[in-house]
C-alpha cells in the first residue's frame, strides 16, 4: 500500500533528472514518429527536398543573395536557368532577322535601358509575348536568346510543376511563380506549348484546374498595375487558335515564326554547316531550292543524315588503307540530295498517316 506521504514529499535530485530524461526520450520518439508518418503520407517529400537543394544551388549560381523564398517559391526556383549558362545567341539563329529586330526594340531595349523609359508607360516592356508558328522553326531558341541578351532570369515553367494532388496547393504554386519572378526581376517566365496549359476554358474543366488557371491569370493581370515591374510571360505554341481569348488579351506582343523562305533556308544551311567538313563545291542555294517546306529542325536533321552517309561509307569500307588514314570524306552535293529525298519520303509518310486517321463525314 502506497502512503499519501509518498506523493507529498519533494522529489530527490536523481528522481528529477530521471523524470526529465524520460520526458526528453518520450518527446524525441514522438517527434520522429510524427515526422516519419508525415513523410510516409506525402510520397513527394523526397522530391521536394531535392528540388529545394537544386534551387539553392541555382540561386547561388545566378548571384541572388539575401532573398528569402517560401517553400513554394523554392519548388519553382528549381526550374531557374542561369542566363550565363545559356549557350544561345542571336548568331545561332538564322533567317529571322525581322523578328529579332522587333524583339530587340520592344522587349530587350526597355529592359536594358530602363532609365530611358521610366517616365513612359507606353514604352515599358510588354507583360506578355507570344511566339507562334509551325514546329521546329526556332521559337524556343528565340526565347532563350532573348533572356540571355536582356540579362533576364529565365524560369522554364512546366505545367506539371503547378499540379498537386492536395487541394489548394496548385493555386499556391501559381502564386509562387509570380512572387518569385518579381523577387528575381528582370525575369522571363517561359511556357513552352502554352496551349496545353492555358487552352480554351469550358464547363467540363476540372474545378481545381479552372481555379488554378483563374489564379494564374489574376496574378498576371497584377503585373500591369506596377509599370516598373520587369516580369515578362513568354509563351510558345504551334496552335494559337486553341489558346483562351483571355490569354491572348494578356499577350499583346505576338511574333509569327513561320517556315523559312528560300533565302532564310540558305542562311540556316550556312549556319548549320559552318564548322562541318563540307566539300567546297557544295551549292547551298541549290539545296535551299530543293527543301521548300522544310523547317529549321528539318534542315538540321537533313544535314545530319548527309553527314552520316559519309560516316557509314567509312565504316563499310573494306580498304585497310582508308582506315589507316582515319579520315572521313567531306559532305558532298549528292549526300545532301540523298538526305533530302529521305526527309521528303519521311514527311510524306507522316502526312499520309495523318490523313488515314481523319474521319470523313
UniProtKB/Swiss-Prot annotation:
**Membrane-spanning ranges:** 16-32
Q: Which subcellular locations apply to this protein?
A: Mitochondrion outer membrane; Peroxisome membrane; Postsynaptic cell membrane
Provide the primary localization. mitochondrion
Alphabetical list of InterPro entries matching this protein: AAA+_ATPase, AAA_lid_3, ATPase_AAA_core, ATPase_AAA_CS, Mito_OM_Translocase_MSP1, P-loop_NTPase
- Effect seen on changing residue 107 to I: In a colorectal cancer sample; somatic mutation
Disorder this protein is connected to according to its UniProt record:
Hyperekplexia 4: An autosomal recessive severe neurologic disorder apparent from birth. HKPX4 is characterized by little if any development, hypertonia, early-onset refractory seizures in some patients, and respiratory failure resulting in early death, mostly in the first months of life.
Its recorded name reads: Outer mitochondrial transmembrane helix translocase
Origin organism is Homo sapiens
Amino acid at each position: 500500500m502506497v502512503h499519501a506521504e509518498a506523493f507529498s514529499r519533494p522529489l530527490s535530485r536523481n528522481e528529477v533528472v530521471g523524470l526529465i530524461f524520460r520526458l526528453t526520450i518520450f518527446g524525441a520518439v514522438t517527434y520522429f514518429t510524427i515526422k516519419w508518418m508525415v513523410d510516409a503520407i506525402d510520397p513527394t517529400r523526397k522530391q521536394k527536398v531535392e528540388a529545394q537543394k537544386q534551387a539553392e544551388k541555382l540561386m547561388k549560381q545566378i548571384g541572388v543573395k539575401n532573398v528569402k523564398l517560401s517553400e513554394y517559391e523554392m519548388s519553382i526556383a528549381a526550374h531557374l536557368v542561369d542566363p550565363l549558362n545559356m549557350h544561345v545567341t542571336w548568331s545561332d539563329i538564322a533567317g529571322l532577322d525581322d523578328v529579332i529586330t522587333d524583339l530587340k526594340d520592344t522587349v530587350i531595349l526597355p529592359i536594358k535601358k530602363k532609365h530611358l523609359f521610366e517616365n513612359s508607360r507606353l514604352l515599358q516592356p510588354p507583360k506578355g509575348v507570344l511566339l507562334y508558328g509551325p514546329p521546329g522553326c526556332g521559337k524556343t531558341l528565340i526565347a532563350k536568346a532573348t533572356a540571355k541578351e536582356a540579362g533576364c532570369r529565365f524560369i522554364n515553367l512546366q505545367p506539371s510543376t503547378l499540379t498537386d494532388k492536395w487541394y489548394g496547393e496548385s493555386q499556391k504554386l501559381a502564386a509562387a511563380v509570380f512572387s518569385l519572378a518579381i523577387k528575381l526581376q528582370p525575369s522571363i517566365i517561359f511556357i513552352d506549348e502554352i496551349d496545353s496549359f492555358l487552352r480554351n476554358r469550358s464547363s467540363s474543366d476540372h474545378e481545381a484546374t479552372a481555379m488554378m488557371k483563374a489564379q494564374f491569370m489574376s496574378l498576371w493581370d497584377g503585373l500591369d498595375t506596377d509599370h516598373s515591374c520587369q516580369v515578362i510571360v513568354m509563351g510558345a505554341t504551334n496552335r494559337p487558335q486553341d489558346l483562351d481569348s483571355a490569354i491572348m488579351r494578356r499577350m499583346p506582343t505576338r511574333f509569327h515564326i513561320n517556315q523559312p523562305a528560300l533565302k532564310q533556308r540558305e542562311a540556316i544551311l550556312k549556319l548549320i554547316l559552318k564548322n562541318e567538313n563540307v566539300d567546297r563545291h557544295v551549292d547551298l542555294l541549290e539545296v535551299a531550292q530543293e527543301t521548300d517546306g522544310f523547317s529549321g529542325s528539318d534542315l538540321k536533321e537533313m544535314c545530319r543524315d548527309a553527314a552520316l552517309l559519309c560516316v557509314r561509307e567509312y565504316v563499310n569500307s573494306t580498304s585497310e588503307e582508308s582506315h589507316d588514314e582515319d579520315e572521313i570524306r567531306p559532305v558532298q552535293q549528292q549526300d545532301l540530295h540523298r538526305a533530302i529525298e529521305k526527309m521528303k519520303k519521311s514527311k510524306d509518310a507522316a502526312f499520309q498517316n495523318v490523313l488515314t486517321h481523319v474521319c470523313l463525314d
